Amino acid sequence: MEEQVANAIEIASNPSADPALKTQAFDFVNQLRSDPSGWQVCLSLFTQTPQRSGIVRHVALEVVNSAAQGGLIDLQALAYVKDGLLAYLRQVYGQDAGASDPPNIQNKIAQTITFLFSALYASGWESFFDDLLGLTQKSPSSTTRDNASGIIFYLRVINSIHDEIGDVLVSRSRNEQDKANALKDLIRQRDMQKITSSWQQILSEWRDGNDVIVEMCLKAVGSWVSWIDIGLVVNQTMLDLLFRQLGRAQKEDLRQGEEKVRDAAVDVFTEIIGKKMKPEDKIDMIIFLNLDTIVSQLSNSPPLHGNRFTFKYDTDLAETVAKLVNITVIDIVRALEQEGVSTECKEKANGLLQAFLPHILRYFSDEYDEVCSTVIPCVSDLLTYLRRIAKVNPALASQHSSILLPILKAIIAKMRYDETSSWGEEDEQTDEAEFQELRKRLGILQQMIASINEQLYMEVVSEMVATTFENLRQSGSQMDWRDLDLALHEMFLFGDLAVKAGSLYTKGNPNNQAAERLIEMMLRMVESDIRSFTHPATQLQYTEICVRYSSFFHHHTHLIPGVLENFLQLVHHPIKKVKTRSWYLFQRLVKQLRQYVGNVAQTVVEALGDLLVIRAELPSEVSEGDEMSSEDHELADAIFNSQLYLFEAVGIICSTPTISPDKQVLYLQAVLNPIFLDMEKNLEAAKSQDERAILQIHHDIMALGTLARGFSDWMPGTNTPATLPAPEVSAAFNQVAEATLVALESLKSSFNVRTAARFAFSRLIGVLGSRILPQLPRWIDGLLTQTSSRDEMALFLRLLDQVIFGFKGEIFSILDTLLTPFLQRVFSGIADPTTGTDDEIQLAELKREYLNFLLAVLNNDLGAVIISERNQPIFETVISTIEHFSKDIDDFTTAKMAFSVLSKMSSSWGGPDVIAEASNGTPPSQAPLPGFGQFMITRFSPLCWALPSTPSFNSKDAQAKQVLAEAGGLQRTIYAKTGMEYLTYLRDRELPGMGMGGELIEEFVGALSRLDLKGFRQFFPVCLSNFHILSI
């Protein structure tokens, strides 16, 4: 059997084995894992002499592990496994044979031994640590820990045990944690003194002999210290051993692996300080350990001081020491801010804070960002503490300037790009992203300082920015771009203090002192020669700042032409990233300065002309045969989407009130005509399904719609101050609508063309107004086709709601004409079967938009169109769909809306209220529909009971209650319109037909006649719940 298992493992791991045979071998080994007796064969395979191959032994032990952890080995058998492995360990590790197992096997054995410890240490293997310690000596008579291979294995298990029961980062169930806590208690009672003594012996005897042993031992001390008696580690013997290892930091040249020992020794101190204890004890511990001196010595060591700013600088040690500084300062601050801490302790903590401030600054200002990031948490805690104090006593803010000033200066310095950075390079993107993330974190710290001492922050930043622009004035393009970028970045952040409600000004005056300072900075920046901004990073910063502080230009209008000229240079930038971002920012700027840019409209349109040429690119055209073609296509899409901002900017500029309508049309035609020609040129090819031509027309239509969006912010029914453009301009945009419709009618089978046309339609409403109404049938015919998705229908319905709301006085005849064919397409979309979750979501959305459309028609006094002679044939379908939706147990939102539509129909067509107290004082908006009262009673009323009669209906569900409230509202509306006729119907037919008893009927009818609309809406859900009618 053993040979069979060994052969199977060998075959399964052999890459050149026959695939069929290999599959059989895999299956055999996997069956072995679940076989209750499989572990016995594998244990024997692992411990055999002579040893099997490494892969056989590894897999064999893995099977044993799997069986043990999977519960296939009972306690008695676990003892057998323990005895077998212990005998193996004594044979291989206990005699310093010199040929111990490779690391992967050692780790696997350690894992097994750790599991056995968890299972048997409490009962069954009480001598666990004695047995393992026995491996650390070459013979029972040895008086020292002299067996290297045994020591390494012992420490490997020690560290594994911590991972199993002591590591707080490991997620455990409640039972697992309870077991871990019990095991820790047992260790502390039985063996802790013994274990810590072994660490001291190992560190003493192997201090210079074996770096691997010393490193592993230090890691064990550092990990276990968090849950053992601190006195077992913090004692003179152990500290002397630790200090000796720290001394390695003073060596100029370390042998390979020695730096790991040094760093592990520092980590021990970090773990000691990280141990939970009272603030008073922690402060005393920091003083006792003399951490200030330790950190000073480490900071002044050759790797961190002598080699700083050279390629030999030891960043690993710097980060390790920074962790020690960080955890120490966090505890110092905690002692300062916690209530109940003695005055004496706080005084000691204050002294420590002053002592550690140079250490904070040293590592916070480290040129390596990962080192700086390591101490950000303690800086954040410190500033949070100082901010809290300043709020309680603002006078203390100035006293803390000695702390805040150097931190602020360090923050600003760290925000500067370092000398090795190369902005914009493809292979630098990760570094750039990490640096920007660091800048964000530093920005938060800077905001905290501003909140503590605003005056200090303003003075430091203002001085830095002013000095930078003065240097720029003197040195021009010779200035290091990093310095200018830093100043601009600080200007951008300064707005957090200066800008209120999106502006630097309130009633024409600067918001505050910060706004005054920022206005001075803006003057310096804008009056600088942009040619001095030679680097793309600074050029982008310039545009971002101009947009963020556009309110500045409202009060310095003479500077606008120069700024626009600078922008027009940047929108032609050779670097794509700068160019496309500038397109967006240019649109933002002209939108915010619309009223001031009319005098340069012609110049701008001409300057942008070459950028308004649309070139659609298919993936194959971008990089044929390249695996990255999809990314290139996304890039091409992103570039076009950015280009649209230019079309919007042109629309904004051309629409300024200072330009006469004829000039507006002239500028518009300069942009529109090339697009019309392009559409005409590509239309025939697009009809032949040429993909590039179809995409080109999609882009053209999107550009036309975006131009319209820029031209007018007005939307029908909105309370915006904007108005429709002049008639001449609307006529020009009528050409846009016509060109779009021609393309749509020819290419309505294309989803992309429909999408672009729907967008254009939504924007053309704002520039055409009611002129668009006669075209509605053509828009509907093109946008709602046999291939249109439910999503498309829902989006268009939403647009129609807006049109109805905006033009309710003019749309009746057109709506009357198109309603039946339009709704037939919607019904078709609703009736189509769904094939997945996405389909179901789209169907639900379409149902809601259909109901919203009906509400829009009814709410805008257009309900007559639904019952007109032309649309009478579809009326029954409209009603039946609503009835169906009102009974949908799986979609309460739609059901609620369905009842709202039925209530609105009832109030619109049911005639005047016959119940005086039910009237809300507003007569029905439309003429009553003959016979509709009886229709409401017989068709609508039973629906109120349909949904709650469903077996799966839960009346306690919050959404269900809302549906019932809406159903109750419908019943009250029917009663208001029909009075006693409805009550009689309920008494004699509807309620008895449902099996309701006479007493309940009278109570229900009484409530209906007695309560007002609001009262009955509340009553109906409670009624159903209390009367248990749900089973009827």
Swiss-Prot record:
Keyword tRNA processing: yes
UniProtKB keywords: Cytoplasm, Nucleus, RNA-binding, Transport, tRNA processing, tRNA-binding
Primary location group: nucleus
Entry superkingdom: Eukaryota
One Gene Ontology cellular component: nuclear pore
One Pfam short name: Exportin-T
Molecular function terms from GO: small GTPase binding; tRNA binding
Keyword Transport: yes
InterPro entries referenced in this protein's UniProt entry, alphabetically: ARM-like (IPR011989), ARM-type_fold (IPR016024), Exportin-1/Importin-b-like (IPR013598), Exportin-T_C (IPR045546), XPOT (IPR040017)
Localization of this protein: Nucleus; Cytoplasm
GO process annotations (BP): tRNA processing; tRNA re-export from nucleus
Protein family per UniProt: Belongs to the exportin family.
Its biological purpose: tRNA nucleus export receptor which facilitates tRNA translocation across the nuclear pore complex. Involved in pre-tRNA splicing, probably by affecting the interaction of pre-tRNA with splicing endonuclease.
Protein name: Exportin-T
Source organism: Aspergillus fumigatus (strain CBS 144.89 / FGSC A1163 / CEA10)
Gene: los1
